[in-house]
């Protein structure tokens, strides 16, 4: 079986497990929307331009709660499941790519709902044609966060408090993704070019892809 077919099968299994458990959209997403509502209610009445903080709140909530969504598959990984994958001859790179694709799809849906909630709660002043560039920024940000979370989950695999340790690994490394995505949306609001920020996101995603594929086998051997 080719690398691509193995990756698609890993993605299919992870999405099937998430569909049955439903943590991302039944538990994490409602809490994220409530957190966004709390932000909107906590803004002082004297602050007139509420829309200005809408995108800031969106990315803060999306990254903080999105980490938990992306880490779900890694946290659910058991030693028995790893042994089965090894016995079946699953390529570690395919596992990384497949899990990253599954997490990215979940994050795209997760961020799409948060984006709608942000527009409804904060009513930002968005220019015409904002949807396409914003969707592009969300897509690349979701892909980067998914790969980073998958890689962090592999590094923290087998350790106590795996979820907390993986979150600590992600926090400093997610900065280029947050900067690129948030500035892309801000540039849209200012009618400026978003090319440099999209290139930053693409470069970060490619670096994470290379690192994840390259480190997948050493990390698997270290976890034995």
Model-derived segments and their meaning:
Residues 1-28:
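Aromatic- and glycine-rich beta-strand/loop motifs that create alpha-glucan
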Residues 92-119:
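Selective transmembrane-helix segments that form parts of the transport pathway or gating/packing helices
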Residues 44-53, 116-139, 185-198:
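Membrane-interfacial helix-loop-helix connectors in multipass membrane proteins
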Residues 137-171, 221-224:
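A structural motif at transmembrane helix-loop-helix junctions in multipass membrane proteins
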Residues 146-153, 176-188:
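Transmembrane alpha-helical segments of integral membrane proteins
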Residues 22-44, 57-66, 168-180, 203-212:
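Hydrophobic alpha-helical transmembrane segments of multi-pass membrane transport/permease proteins
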Residues 120, 205-224:
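Junction motif at the cytosolic side of a transmembrane helix
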Residues 18, 67-86, 100:
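Transmembrane helix boundary and interhelical loop/hinge segments in multi-pass membrane proteins
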